[in-house]
Structure formats: C-alpha cells, structure tokens
C-alpha cells in the first residue's frame, strides 16, 4: 500500500475504500490498474526515494517555518490581528499534516503500513482536517478582507481578534463533521497479503462512495474557491473605484498590502491543489492512471499539495513587513544568544586555563 495525499475522494469515486488519504485501490476496475504494494513496478525505487526525500525536505522546512509563524503571533501583541489569527490557524493545520509526512514516506518506501491501527486513524483524520481547515480558513481570510475593504465601518465591530478566534473554533468544528467519521472508519487491515491503512466506505458502497466523493470535492475545494473568487472580484472593483479606502494614506497602504498578501496565499494554495484535483476529475470520468508515467505525475502532484504547507511562511516573510521584522528580530536574537553562549564558554575556558597556570607557578619544584 502506498498512501497518497490530499484527495480522499479519489478512490471512493469507484470502489470500497482508499488507502491513506488518496489511493487508486478499487474493486470495480481491472486489478492491473491498481496502485498498491503488489504493483511496485509502477514506481521504481529511485523514484520512491526521490518522492520521500521531497517529503522529508518539505516536512523539515515546513515545520520550522510554521512553528516560527505561530511563535511570532503568540509572542508579539501587535501581531494578534484578525488576519494573523487566521494565519495562525492555517499554520497550525499545516504543522499537523507535516508531522504525518515521515509516516507516509515510510509507507511509500516499504509498500505497506507498519505503524498500527491507532496511528493509521490519526494520520487519516489529520489529512482530512488539514484539507478542510485550510480551505475554510482561506475562505474566512478572504471574507475578512472583503469586509475590511468594502465595509470599513462595519469592520470595526466585526474584525476583532476574539471573533477571529471564534471563527477558527467553528472551522475545526465543521472539519470534525468529516474528520471524526473517517477516523472511525479508518483502520489498518490486511489487503492482498499486505497491511494497508484505509477507510472503509459503508454499504451500499456503490451509493455512498460517489456521494462521499462529490461532497468532499464540493465542500473542500469548489465552493470555497467560488466564495474566495466572489470576494476578491468585489474587492478589486472597490479598490479600482476609490483612491483612498480610509482617511489615512498609511492605513490605506496597509489595507492594500494585507489584501495582496491574502490574495497571493490563496493563489498559491489553488495552484498547488488544482493539479491533483484535475486528476480526481479525470478519474471521475473513468480514466485510470495505468502507466508508470501517470502514477509518477500523480505522486508529484500530491507532493505539490504538501509543498503548499511549507510555502506560506516564506510568503509572509516576503510580503508582510511585520512578519519580516519579527522573523529578522527572532533570527538576530538567536544569533546573539549563540554568540553570548560562545563568549561565555571562551571566558570560562580562559579563566580555567589562567587558574591552572597560576597553580603550576606557585607549586614548589622538588629539590
């Protein structure tokens, strides 16, 4: 079994279960089209190692970046704005899913799931939670930007950090509508003499599979993207229609800067997720990736979804002056702390050497 991310509706369009979070396992198509441990010819070892290496690089870089983002927001009071509260939620979801990459990478290399039932359920649930919390959070950020740009008076009451926190809680609650059931249905089972981490679709599978697939596709991607598109269309019309959104040029620049940041984050998200969504639609039309090239492309498109989780901190550093200043302050403080530690260590060694020299000078030589 080789678990894939991030489209759990891939297999359920056709069959009884999927493995991990995205799989080609399917009981209704010819067996030679299936992607599992018994068909490792689809992916050579070198390609598997390349994909797993990409996973590990994304995992390490993404964890460092997202943890730094969360630290900066928690550490600095001025960073606790409504937009940054949503960014914190996005970083939290990305951090959780990045923690699953070592397990999924091991699964890809070995061709089976070696971590047991409990961890299988956990990884599956985190994949789904990340999928929904990310899209819902980006949607909330876009609506938040729309209110700030198009309804500045109402924004004074609506756009508060406490209300943003409440929205984040609601986002996780909504994601639980899918996350909890798939965690219950997920299990490590023996399939084709290999242990696989999979989700069993309830019977009748011919009915619930497509229903589940369509709902996931609509609510995790299409509807959020449509809402985001409407919000930004209205914002662009507003921004073109007025020279100043507020009475202050400085405040106006900040509004436009933050709006641009959110737009870029959304655009990168859609760009990273669209390829695998296209694969899902292609399979939905009955086309199965039956060649090594098709499977390899699918793997890298899946990895691209993970790459998105480590790109956001980089975007914040380049596009937001406040994040850039906080990141620079953190890095400089860390470097200064290391220099002080080295300096203290050098002084301590010098002191010890000096005491040793004094002692040797005062000890009388034997006659």
From Swiss-Prot:
G-protein coupled opioid receptor that functions as a receptor for the endogenous neuropeptide nociceptin. Ligand binding causes a conformation change that triggers signaling via guanine nucleotide-binding proteins (G proteins) and modulates the activity of down-stream effectors. Signaling via G proteins mediates inhibition of adenylate cyclase activity and calcium channel activity. Arrestins modulate signaling via G proteins and mediate the activation of alternative signaling pathways that lead to the activation of MAP kinases. Belongs to the G-protein coupled receptor 1 family. It is found in: Cell membrane; Cytoplasmic vesicle. Keywords: Behavior, Cell membrane, Cytoplasmic vesicle, Disulfide bond, G-protein coupled receptor, Glycoprotein, Lipoprotein, Membrane, Palmitate, Phosphoprotein, Receptor, Transducer, Transmembrane, Transmembrane helix. This is Nociceptin receptor. The record marks 107, 127 as: Important for G protein-mediated signaling. GO terms for biological process: adenylate cyclase-inhibiting G protein-coupled receptor signaling pathway; calcium-mediated signaling; neuron-neuron synaptic transmission; phospholipase C-activating G protein-coupled receptor signaling pathway; sensory perception of pain. The chain crosses the membrane at residues 46-71, 85-106, 122-143, 163-185, 209-233, 262-282, 298-319. CDD domains: 7tmA_NOFQ_opioid_R. Glycans are attached at residues 21, 26, 36. GO terms for cellular component: cytoplasmic vesicle; plasma membrane; synaptic membrane. Coiled coil: none annotated.
